Structure formats: structure tokens, C-alpha cells
Regions:
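Long, ordered, amphipathic alpha-helical scaffolds
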Residues: 169, 174-181, 185-216
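Amphipathic alpha-helical scaffolding segments comprising HEAT/armadillo-like alpha-solenoid repeats
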Residues: 1-6, 24-38, 57-70, 89-101, ...
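Alpha-helix N-cap/helix-start positions at coil->helix boundaries
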Residues: 11-12, 27, 42-43, 74-75, ...
Length: 216
């Protein structure tokens, strides 16, 4: 990689050159990005992965994104996850699932978020188990968010039962919203209890669900 600069000006850094490649059309730019993704410096590799994700034809280098999910640098891995999420790259599914067991909390959190964009129904038990068992609040909340976004009729009641007793008010609110969308009137007694919740948002969501279900 090279970049001409005016006489007396500081030459651009490698990071700057890599970032500019994301805006350049043509095979030469893609080849340069592919080479940059293999550089020794982890932050230069991360910059290359990010640039590939932003390049109009970056998907031609999707094999490099898949490889980056196994990179020894957590920074590179997380950036690759972000590209997978942006592209909704289903080919990366199993590699992202494997990252749910990564020692890094930040990487696990990013992997959960990414999995939500390439979700398959079989992911529900895995992410629900993380929601139940993780001791880090950030991980539990990320898992809960993905579960809420991906809820459907097959497992909404499992989520409702867990969310409606969660200490986080937002999750209790989600329980009410799930009931409103998927439930039948037999769940009204539980919603009645939630309508007296200490949190105003939960009470409002519970009353709305009660009104919706009562009209069915």
C-alpha cells in the first residue's frame, strides 16, 4: 500500500490508507484490503476488516471475514462480527455460535448481538440458557434483547414466564408486550399482578395487554 503526499506533508499512516481503500472501486483496492487483513499489526487488520465491511464490493472478500472470526485478536474478531451483522452473513452462523463461549465478555456480547441478525430457530435454547445462567448483567441483557426481538409463537410463553419475574423492569415490560402479541385471555391473572408493578412502564404495558386480550 502506498499513497502519494505533497512535498513536506506527513505521509498518511497505514490506518489512513486502509480506510481510504473502502472508498475505492476496482480489483486493486480489494486486493490491497485482502493483503491488509493479513498484516501483523492487529489494529491494522481490524481496520482492514472494517474497510472490507464498508466497501461496495466487500462481499467478494467474505472468506476473509469468516477467517477473521478466528483471529487471535479479540478486536479483529469483534469487528468481523460487526461486518457479519451488517451483511447478515448466514455463512458465519456456526463461527458466531462458537464465539458465545469466548473468554472475553465483550466478544461474547458482540457475538450474541450478531447472532440476532443471522438467527435460526435452533438458536433459541442456546441464547435462553445464556440469559438464565450468565452472571454478567451486560450479557444477560444482550441475550434478553435478542430473545425479545426473535420471539415467536413457539416459545413466547417460555420467555414470558422468565421475563415477568425478572428484576429488570424493562424485561417485565417485555413480558407484557409478549402477552399482548401472542397470548389468550387465560394469562390475564398474571397480567393483573403486573398491572400493580412498582414500575410505571410495566403497569402501562400490563394494562394495555389486558385491554387487548379482553377484547379478543
Amino acid at each position: 500500500m502506498s499513497c502519494n503526499s505533497p512535498s513536506g506533508a506527513h505521509p498518511p499512516t497505514t490506518h489512513q490508507v486502509i480506510r481510504k481503500l473502502a472508498l475505492q472501486e476496482g480489483a486493486a483496492a480489494l486486493k490491497a484490503l485482502a493483503n491488509a487483513a493479513g498484516l501483523e499489526d492487529q489494529f491494522e487488520r481490524r481496520a482492514a476488516i472494517d474497510a472490507i465491511g464498508r466497501h461496495p464490493h466487500g462481499r467478494e472478500l467474505r472468506s476473509i471475514i469468516l477467517r477473521a472470526l478466528r483471529d487471535p485478536s479479540e478486536y479483529v474478531v469483534r469487528t468481523a462480527c460487526e461486518v457479519v451483522a451488517q451483511w447478515e452473513l448466514q455463512e458465519a452462523h456456526e463461527l458466531v455460535v462458537a464465539l458465545l463461549a469466548n473468554p472475553s465478555k465483550a466478544t461474547r456480547q458482540t457475538a450474541i448481538r450478531t447472532l440476532g441478525t443471522i438467527w435460526v430457530d435452533a438458536d433459541f435454547p442456546t441464547v435462553f440458557r445464556i440469559y438464565n445462567d450468565a452472571w454478567e448483567n451486560e450479557i444477560r441483557r444482550e441475550a434478553a434483547w435478542v430473545l425479545r426481538q426473535r420471539a415467536h409463537s413457539a416459545h413466547w410463553r417460555t420467555l414470558f414466564d422468565a421475563f415477568q419475574v425478572d428484576e429488570l423492569a424493562r424485561h417485565r415490560q417485555w413480558a407484557c408486550e409478549l402477552a399482548e402479541k401472542f397470548s389468550v385471555p387465560d394469562i390475564l391473572p398474571v397480567l393483573s399482578q403486573l398491572s400493580s408493578d412498582v414500575d410505571g412502564h410495566v403497569r402501562k404495558a400490563a394494562w394495555r395487554a389486558i385491554q387487548t386480550l379482553s377484547s379478543r
